[in-house]
Amino acid sequence: MSQEGLSYAAAGVDIEAYERALERVKPLIAATHGKEVAEGVGPFAGLYALPGGGHLAASADGVGTKIKVAIATGNHRVIGADIVSHCVNDIATASARPLFFLDYFATGKLDPAVFGQLIEGMSEACRDAGCALLGGETAEMPGVYALGDYDLAGFIVGLVEQDARREAPSAGDVLVGLRSSGLHTNGYSLARKVFEGAALSPDLSAALMAPHLCYLAEMQKLPWKAAAHITGGGIPGNLPRALPVGLAAVVHKDAWKPNPIFAEIRRRGKVSDDEMWGTFNMGLGMILVMEASAVPEGVTVVGEVVEQSGPERVTFR
């Protein structure tokens, strides 16, 4: 297959088709919600009101086909930490303190060494985030997974204190970007297609297996109003989820330099600019909305919030 104009859809992941499917089932999901559900499908975490005040925040995630790179490199500990960090970041956008985490591990035949590495990574990441690895499910499914293959998913619950809700974003606020280590856990189907047949050099392996950073500690120190975890769909697909209706974002591409791995993916795969920005985090793992006067020294301002004047919620300049 020619690599001319590689895209995420051509690599087997059609985000637009997923979004259409999700829209169709949203009424079924909403039909299960009572008055306790403060946030449902859409934000990065669901919120469930507690009788005494405050909310539980919950999220579920996977690590995608980064697992294939882990299998090729033998580095499974990173994957274990990645799934925890991904989940923690999602509920951190709701100002939640992680309480407990559960995992689901499925494989064709259990490899104790691989399983041990995954649990080591999860345990370390849970300790760093201050949450309990409460339990999980381990499933051997021969005939469903090929020998050596596996999948991993995570589920997290956190607590949003009664006084933790934040002021809503408004026009004039600024966007602060928190740097990523690389792809984190998204875009790997496209990246793997780009590097298909290429030797995994130590440098390339390290870049592709860079850990999904956890932003909890950093976010707890900053005065933000809203936060967007930049995962599947990139900045255009995630930043609008942090903005109220009627607001949009202007993002300045020259405010930071994406990690070298993104330039390599673009070059090798002849991937278009729109495809790159709509698939990968491009060097920012989290974007915070802050009041301009509250921005501390040393952070990277990458854009601003404006009144929405057209169909686009995110404009790049």
Regions found by a protein language model. Give the residues of each.
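Glycine-/charge-enriched secondary-structure boundary and capping motifs
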Residues: 2-12, 114-132, 145-150, 197-208, ...
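N-terminal amphipathic/basic leader segments beginning at the initiator methionine
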Residues: 2-35
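Glycine-rich phosphate/pyrophosphate-binding loop regions near the starts of catalytic domains
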Residues: 27-181, 291
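Short, acidic Gly/Pro/Ser/Thr-rich loop/turn segments
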Residues: 63-66, 161-164, 183-185, 233-237, ...
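A structural signal for small-residue-enriched, beta-sheet-centric alpha/beta enzyme cores
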Residues: 175-183, 227-232
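Flexible glycine-rich active-site/ligand-binding loops centered on an Asp-His dyad
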Residues: 183, 191, 304-308
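Short, compositionally biased
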Residues: 188-198
